[in-house]
């Protein structure tokens, strides 16, 4: 279970292990922070699908769409010193993919500076129909 740091917002994350290939995928589509337990889980995974909902903490209020920040809704924004991009830089997981991306997030715009920042960090941007293959069967 993942808890937001600002208010009582709870989410769920899953770790899935393929016992044939001994590969592991962790799915955390809504996370307000990356604590040590989650960091260890990421480090022990071959692939992580992580919360890519918002680029900035004030994304919706700044667009006049709502009043709550990303973190108030249980989402760690990608940008900023404490954002997920910064925190994921030191996590050595082989494959990192942002999922659960809000339609206001500029990483969805091809060739946007935000998308290029994500790609340059070696993190993939999930899309409809994405297929993930983990490991090779013996």
What are the language-model segments listed below?
Residues 4-13, 20-24, 31-130:
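Cap/insert and terminal regions of metallo-dependent hydrolase folds
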Residues 136-138:
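Short, surface-exposed amphipathic charged segments that create phosphate/polyanion-binding patches used
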